[in-house]
């Protein structure tokens, strides 16, 4: 028996909030290679989400939502500096956990940055591959496949 159009859509969509997407987010996925993480962010698309992969100046890998929380500029064009990734438009600085470290242009006594968090996902590196986990906490252990270790 063939699937209806609606059933096919439900089973094949992997975006956030879809049945397939919510199931697949509970696994680790390869998102890049360690040697790609030089001093520039790298744009990625995983499970229907636009993301940016980078390595900060403390050698930590990070995976953030692609678009700046402030004005929606692509962080693919950001600069890796000062412990995070700085947006090229207004200079907001994000660390690998999505925490906002600096908000240039905001009043010095503003606490706005403390109430806002940028989308960020867990990453781990194994055998030169960067893996990402987009699901809810707690993340499962990253499988140690025998071909990788």
Regions found by a protein language model. Give the residues of each.
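Rieske [2Fe-2S] iron-sulfur-binding domain
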Residues: 2, 33-149
């Amino acid at each position: 028996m063939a699937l209806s159009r609606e059933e096919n859509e439900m089973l094949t969509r992997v975006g956030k909030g879809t049945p397939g997407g919510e199931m697949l987010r509970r696994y680790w996925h390869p998102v890049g290679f360690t040697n790609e993480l030089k001093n520039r962010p790298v744009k990625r698309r995983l499970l229907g989400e636009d993301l940016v992969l980078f390595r900060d100046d403390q050698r930590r890998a990070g995976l953030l939502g692609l678009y700046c929380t402030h004005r929606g500029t692509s962080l693919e064009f950001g600069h890796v500096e000062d412990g995070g990734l700085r947006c090229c438009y207004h200079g907001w600085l994000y660390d690998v956990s999505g925490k906002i470290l600096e908000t240039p242009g905001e009043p010095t006594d503003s606490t706005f940055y403390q109430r806002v968090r940028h989308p960020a996902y867990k990453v781990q590196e194994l055998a030169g591959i960067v893996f990402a986990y987009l699901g809810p906490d707690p993340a499962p252990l990253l499988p140690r496949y025998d071909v990788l270790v």
